[in-house]
């Protein structure tokens, strides 16, 4: 077997030294995450999608516990010695190992996602491949500087609804304004789905919810907006909806999941909201998985009728 091998990951994913993992010794299972995958220099470029850092590794062949199997053009092991790391944002890495940066069709997307403006500037003339992930993930991660780079790059702006949906769900108001202004003053389309509002509500991002209401754009949302906010204990979102004057849509999942998750404060909110109380006959909602009695006590004191699915003996 060769002496030098490589694996690709992210900068903070592994530490230099011995790395261990759970291990699957089935050679026919090419997709299991149980194991550390590595390859030789010939196939490095086939795994550029795995991350932004190239790790040089040494096999711990003197270790009696060391196990590995071959799976196609790579191997899977239970432990590896990481000797050194090299950034795939550095052109010297490609030169050192005889790689071609133009073969890395993922690095522009990674650079945009991580806010690597210097890399984008240095490689502009290379016309590296990129996908909608560049703008989508820059938006989701709130990288206005990256969005501005793409705007002035002269390159085609590739993006999907995830740009605005994700920015809204993360509460990146500056990104939402960036896209709206771009749509107003150019011919690009302002793309979004119901997840823009649903995810903002689920994550308690009331600034995003207020932004949507204030801009007077068509408001698209589903019962997930309220149901998920209840499940995630985002009472600030629930308060916002109650005061918004907008139509409030929800299902039995709101109170059912609050019960299942032991969120008595959310149930209190529903009881005081003045809204119709919807809940199901699913008895699992009244039994706490950790043995706590808070929910049973709450329902007993609430005065509400418990809709048991099965008889209690």
UniProtKB/Swiss-Prot annotation:
Species in which this protein is naturally found: Acanthamoeba polyphaga mimivirus (APMV)
UniProt protein name: Uncharacterized protein L696
Domain of life: Viruses
PANTHER family named in the record: ANKYRIN REPEAT-CONTAINING PROTEIN
